Amino acid sequence: MEAGYAEIAAVQFNIAGDNDHKRQGVMEVTISNLFEGTLPAEGGIYDARMGTTDHHYKCITCSHQRKQCMGHPGILQMHAPVLQPLFIAEIRRWLRVICLNCGAPIVDLKRYEHLIRPKRLIEAASSQTEGKQCYVCKAVHPKIVKDSEDYFTFWVDQQGKIDKLYPQIIREIFSRVTYDTVVKLGRSKNSHPEKLVLKAIQIPPISIRPGIRLGIGSGPQSFHDINNVIQYLVRKNLLIPKDLQIVRGQKIPLNIDRNLQTIQQLYYNFLLDSVSTTATQGGTGKRGIVMGARPAPSIMRRLPRKEGRIRKSLLGSQVWSISRSTICGNSDLHLDEVGYPISFARTLQVAETVQHYNINRLMPYFLNGKRQYPGCSRVYKQITQSVHDIEGLKQDFRLEVGDILYRDVVTGDVAFFNRQPSLERSSIGVHRIVVLENPKISTFQMNVSACAWYNADFDGDQMNLWVPWSVMSRVEAELLCSVRNWFISTKSSGPVNGQVQDSTVGSFLLTRTNTPMGKNVMNKLHAMGLFQTTQTDPPCFANYSPTDLLDGKSVVSMLLKQTPINYQRAPTWYSEVYAPYMHYNKQDISTQIRNGELIEGVLDKKAVGAGSSGGIYHLISRRYGPQQALKMIFATQQLALNYVRNAGFTVSTADMLLTPEAHQEVQEIINKLLLESEEINNRLLHGDIMPPIGLTTHDFYEKLQLNALKFPDRILKPIMNSINPETNGLFQMVATGAKGSNPNMIHIMAGIGQIEINTQRIQPQFSFGRTLVYYPRFALEAQAYGFICNSYIAGLTSPEFIFGEMNGRFDLINKALSTSSTGYANRKAIFGLQSCIVDYYRRVSIDTRLVQQLYGEDGLDARQLETVRFETIMLSDQELEDKFKYTGIQSPLFEEEFSRLKKDRDKYRQIFLNVENFNFSQLLTDVRQVPVNVASIVKNILLSSTSGVLPFDEKSILQKYAMVKTFCKNLPYVFINNIQERLQTPIPVYLKRAAALMRMLIRIELATVKTLNITCEQMSAILDLIRLQYTQSLINYGEAVGILAAQSVSEPLTQYMLDSHHRSVAGGTNKSGIVRPQEIFSAKPVEAEQSSEMLLRLKNPEVETNKTYAQEIANSIELITFERLILQWHLLYETYSSTKKNVMYPDFASDVEWMTDFLENHPLLQPPEDIANWCIRLELNKTTMILKSISLESIINSLRAKHPNTYIMHSVENTASGIPIIIRIYLRESAFRRSTNTRMATDEKIAVNVVDKLLNSTIRGIPGIKNANVVKLMRHRVDAQGKLVRLDNIYAIKTNGTNIFGAMLDDNIDPYTIVSSSIGDTMELYGIEAARQKIISEIRTVMGDKGPNHRHLLMYADLMTRTGQVTSLEKAGLNAREPSNVLLRMALSSPVQVLTDAAVDSAVNPIYGIAAPTLMGSVPRIGTMYSDIIMDEKYITENYKSVDSMIDML
């Protein structure tokens, strides 16, 4: 009878009690001895029944040696019970809620029935139970006190009498608790409180203890500390009397009390870490045991942290053998090849089973042995099931079928190649090994274009390489992890690889028109030589004579025709910036490839560069597959490099030198910048700088200086005039996108300009206001603050060099400090999203809980997308009719077609105009990513056709229209199946929406007016190709899209954080570095956000085009507190007087004059009789009042309304220049009195509190709006003719701070277009769906052009909002989303705490996702393992072919 097979569906966690320990234990530890002679002592802590770690003896329980024995636990029967150290808090809860006399609950259990199970006992224990009378025995419940200086001692305080609760007493109390009480308080029967006090503790198996005997030979033997702790525990236990009985309130001997306490401490140290290094009781609250000079180790210490069992052993990948070395470039290798040193190849072994078909190939390895490469090291003999070293074999040893040969690595083997950190799945790729025969080479070699997969370079990076052993693993590796699978990026949907640096320049030079001296014109022989190393099918040169000349375009076309494509785009080489300074050949300003032939233009970064979405290699990959694209990259690279080697290309210092005239012009530009900076300095010295609200004078001055010292665009003019673009290597590198940028060129040739550290100029760090010792005190010239006039080629002075090094040092430190934060953020994202897997309906779910109804809302794989343009979007109604309405045949069908196109256009506009209105910077565009480029398919079909121009046929036109209409109608069935399509079952709305964009594009590109020259057969072929590509673009079942999203967001987010020092200081916001990403992913509430902002559109269209009116509204909503209007204030203790008779502070004696005038002008505002001696004198900032349009009257009225217990006097508003506005606020006696009319003891404290309230008083504005500025917006609208018009004269208000509700109450603000960056504020007012959209837009705003495909952002947003509340990606968010997945939460962090809570709650953990199955030792259901494979064994048996029968058939 065969054994059954089943998978573990779930795991339940419970508290283990005495019975559990006894049932699992194989023996009882009774003595503290370890060994008797060379064998373990029977009954000791090394008893052989618990396993073996020594080769001298076997395990008595299972009779296995040390490698096969898994270990078996033992038990230690305690003479006195001990508390379970992991559940001290749980013990205290139970003691608070149950009667110590009868075990009945003290609290009313019905009050907690509405709570979820885990919360019931916690809430009951937090209620007031002291002094309550038991409902059953009427005993009064005492106060339970936990010892402040001890971790596990409880005291009972009853009417002043304090008794100690020993574990034995607690055990007796808990034994009286009924199971019904346990269940009603939310705990499981398996978590009865009696289990929290143990009489029998478990001794772990020997095999899992951290160590064994360390002492060997003479001298005392040494054992690992954890064994010593167990030894002490056994010895102390023997000192306790077996029949010890402890009665509550009874005194016990001091020595026994100390022994009981020591046993409890030893058990604590045995399970948990010791936090104290003292062996006696101290003030830390816990006692610890010291082993020599270090605290004792523990069992639980092995679980957490990176080196713990969970992360290192259970979740970490392990291989038998691995190699690691530095990488270097080798362009002779294919992109999917890796050069492997021969010394490594002879060390790393590959296991290969001998078969009939490979025995002849393996025999040379067997004969060579270890003496000669390629050889082998050992042989596994199937008959004897033993391993033999190859050097110790006898002469008659034969290699037979079924044996396993451990041979050397040879060329052609597949290997995993990896560079850490592995932030993306492309960080582990499979390459084919090419063994490097040169023994002096000891580095891995790879093609320079392959670095993009690993984010590697050749500045000392090291990588890992290991070879899979079994045939199955080798096949899986090649199919699943081959680098061709990573050619298209999941993050950006574009190609990862392409030409870099030299090959980019070489491709440009080879394909240029009229190259100087005709360098790219060659004869037949030279053209054939360029193809020598391409390793492709050589083109036919038979049609060319030796004297015929070929240009570079012809040579490249010979290569491109092997994979014909159509391509048209402007190259990187052509730039409007350079156009005024150089002459462009008309044939080089647009690159066009038609059916594989380069008609015009050049190949540069935009066409063949790495990461060029929509470039040549992207199109080849989409049409012919990624393997062909990789071959074409290598072939083009070889062509370009061979050409560069022959024609020559270099960058020398001559390319970096300016002519004297150009140098003079550069100096004039720099001198103008310095002059402007000096003018700003003069304005500062004369007090003429007026900063806006929210900025200090210093901050505004620095901002003016930064703007003034920026190099203008015209500095390129002298550079371009002094170089020859046709021959200058540096310029060609920059212009073609091979390397460098315009700022790099300016720094090298003209000047470096202002050095910024953290977006600020160099600030004075030395004493006495100096930036460096080279400059005097308080120097204001730009050079003293980091402005470098010289260029790199001209050389830097000492202070200039130091300024440059300061910037480099800041970047270095910034990167080092950010690495740990970004690494942990990546790990949290991986664990938070890893359970999201695509099911058979292409839904995304966590186990059975839905996250997305359809992945990415369209079910498409991010790697299978192309960028296309929707032609109808920007057209007016008349333009749309002229271009797309077919009038050749009078039929209502074509009216219907045009109406459908118009509706599609309007729908598209409506959707994306709403997106534009509710985002800060995402403007409407007619370019989108779709799975099928319909225009390209049509073009390819027409180019491959030989029928020419066809006459119009009314019947065929109607037939083609019907075909397209039917196809668009049935397109959503691609998500279902053909059966449902034949039955025409109703299509769900969400599937119709998923295919909406694709159907729009098909109707546009296959409109009747555009397909007149297409036959019905061609139309059928086009539609079939569209359906095929669309189907192939769908996401695969079992895809771990959560991990893909985490990797795609975390990697560019890491780069964003490292580049945070480039942020802008404008606007007063702080969206920099790690702050804003943490706010988004941590789901912080509104009050905790540091960088929230709002964009407010104005309701009146006339006002939103007037900046002055918009600024007035911005001033009115900006929160102005009294403190912002004050220059200085004083709290004075003086007697009020309106004359000079009474003594006043001498500095303010002049106030009497305006105080007298105030009383004369305001006869109704006479001082009250109860004025106290406390006065607050304030001087107002007139400049701020003018800029914010705040009158003195409004300030006084606001203060009087909010502070009635004061008497306020003020000077006139229109004071002379230089004389401030003064307000005196006198406190009244009522402010110092209680309701009992008794005077408070500290009048000064009350006066200070009143000052604080005064300063924080709101004068005007919306709470939460710290700053409001007018910004210029760019938006679209549809005019009366139906044309999409771009408006760039709209003014809106951008605020620092958020309060959507407050903004909606303002009559000047349009409530329908309020945009807030705060997820919490959006959620509070608009609901969870709005918060979901806000998460997407905020991640996109933060990451900018480095943002990933929007499907990954949707994954983040849907997961964070799935529960109906915004949950974070932190530990708390994971607990809320997946409370039952204990193993996943344990793998993320704090495994001890997670396991403890799970045991208390008796949690049941269903096994799903990735972490849980991995921890349980099974394979997660993802990818190719998602689907079960059903095998018909009967069919296989009946159709089995032996080797002989196959030979006979052949």
Swiss-Prot record:
GO biological processes: DNA-templated transcription; DNA-templated viral transcription
Induction, per UniProt: Expressed in the late phase of the viral replicative cycle.
InterPro entries: DNA-dir_RpoC_beta_prime (IPR045867), RNA_pol_asu (IPR000722), RNA_pol_N (IPR006592), RNA_pol_Rpb1_1 (IPR007080), RNA_pol_Rpb1_3 (IPR007066), RNA_pol_Rpb1_3_sf (IPR042102), RNA_pol_Rpb1_4 (IPR007083), RNA_pol_Rpb1_5 (IPR007081)
Catalytic activity: RNA(n) + a ribonucleoside 5'-triphosphate = RNA(n+1) + diphosphate
Subcellular compartments: Virion
An example molecular function term from Gene Ontology annotations: DNA binding
Pfam families xref list: RNA_pol_Rpb1_1, RNA_pol_Rpb1_2, RNA_pol_Rpb1_3, RNA_pol_Rpb1_4, RNA_pol_Rpb1_5, RNA_pol_Rpb1_7
GO terms for cellular component: DNA-directed RNA polymerase complex; virion component
EC number: 2.7.7.6
SMART domains assigned to the protein according to its UniProt record, in alphabetical order: RPOLA_N
Signal peptide residues on this chain, from the entry's feature table: none
Principal cellular location given in the protein's record: virion
Keyword Transferase recorded: yes
Family per similarity comment: Belongs to the RNA polymerase beta' chain family.
This protein's domain notes: Lacks the typical C-terminal domain (CTD).
PANTHER family: DNA-DIRECTED RNA POLYMERASE (PTHR19376), DNA-DIRECTED RNA POLYMERASE I SUBUNIT RPA1 (PTHR19376:SF11)
Name of the featured protein: DNA-directed RNA polymerase RPB1 homolog
Organism, as annotated: African swine fever virus (strain Badajoz 1971 Vero-adapted)
